[in-house]
Amino acid sequence: MRISIFGLGYVGAVCAGCLSGRGHEVVGVDISAAKIDMINQGKSPIVEPGLGELLAEGVKTGRLRGTTNVTEAVLATELSMLCVGTPSKLNGDLELDYIEEVCRQMGSALRDKTERHTVVVRSTVLPGTVHNVVIPILEEFSGKKAGVDFGVAVNPEFLRESTAIKDYNFPPMTVIGELDKASGRRLASIYAELDAPIVRKGIAVAEMIKYTCNVWHATKVTFANEIGNIAKAAGVDGREVMEVVCMDNKLNLSQYYMRPGLAFGGSCLPKDVSALSYRAHLWDIEAPLISSLMRSNAAQVQKAYDMIDKHGSRKVALLGLSFKAGTDDLRESPQLELAEMLIGKGFKLSIFDSNVEYARDHGANGHYIKNEIPHVSALLQSDLDKVVAEADVIVLGNADPRFEKLAKDVPAGKKVIDLVGFMPQRTAGAAEGICW
């Protein structure tokens, strides 16, 4: 494919070398004449192992050249990758001046181009940037319609400095955010020979995926450091602790606990997070990430309450009171906390949880349910259909499979709030998810 790459910094230069190395005809574009001269001499403008050889081979074979002329590059290629920088402002927001200027020039070049062109944003931009900034500028300066006259896609990069070429050739996945199917197909064809899954999503989803991955990486580093600091204060080698923690691929390093939803609860997590946070404070150890977990957890319960409250109806059904399906354990249950909030605010609440109801009458937790939370116990009902019928707002509190149908087929005249993830997809209908 004929590809132009705008911005020849770390991302752009690596992409230029790797794409030309795989047989594509590449035109590198940069405002720096010095960088363009280096590219045309087959030299790398950055320090990256193996890149110089790739660029030299690309120039030697005629598959790679550089230019400062945006129009020339757009007219000579089928697809353009925007790899320009998006530095931080003093307030933490993104500086989009480079993106905006390139889009203006690219839009002007597209005005006179008859062949369909695809614009790919590889720069890291916040969700909404392509729809609210990139596309409007391209359409204004080209006089054309995105998704009709030209294609638009997002292709976040996951390259690490010093291992960028290996990361390009052996990615964990290739993420494509597509405005239209044709744009996604054209971009996907570039990566077809890589041994990695190609994930095609909407543009905003792809933008968010990039930030989520980077923030997750930063979170892991910070978490390990805080654990290490607390461990050292306890006379323990934090490296030894984390080595064993990382051996667990079933829970610790897995998809488990990695789905948005309601807050965590149960007998272990809240208690242990609180205990470790307290001990860190006692030892004068700064652990702001770990110390923030309980506050963040409480905020998620508050968000669930706010979602219920905004509907205006006072008749609410809470389906699931225990912190997870298949148990009667109410210790630190966020569902129980939510119920307490609703009761305290005067909602007419009815609750269905057959496990908790059974435990109240027959189980070991009966004393607690009847004597410690009698105001909640009195609201438990045994007829699911009746509970649903008498409510205006139905809250799916835990993953009891009996509740799933309500998210997919909302009863007429009802609102469903899904705290679990039963909804098959985000919709604008009568069902709403806490994070979707």
UniProtKB/Swiss-Prot annotation:
One biological process term in Gene Ontology: alginic acid biosynthetic process
Keywords tagged on the record: Alginate biosynthesis, NAD, Oxidoreductase
Pathway(s): Glycan biosynthesis; alginate biosynthesis
GO molecular function: GDP-mannose 6-dehydrogenase activity; NAD binding
Superkingdom field: Bacteria
Catalyzed reactions per annotation: GDP-alpha-D-mannose + 2 NAD(+) + H2O = GDP-alpha-D-mannuronate + 2 NADH + 3 H(+)
Enzyme Commission number(s): 1.1.1.132
UniProt-annotated binding residues for NAD(+): 10-11, 30, 35, 86, 124, 271, 331
Active site positions: 268
The family this protein is said to belong to: Belongs to the UDP-glucose/GDP-mannose dehydrogenase family.
PANTHER family the UniProt entry points to: GDP-MANNOSE 6-DEHYDROGENASE, UDP-GLUCOSE 6-DEHYDROGENASE TUAD
Protein's name in the database: GDP-mannose 6-dehydrogenase
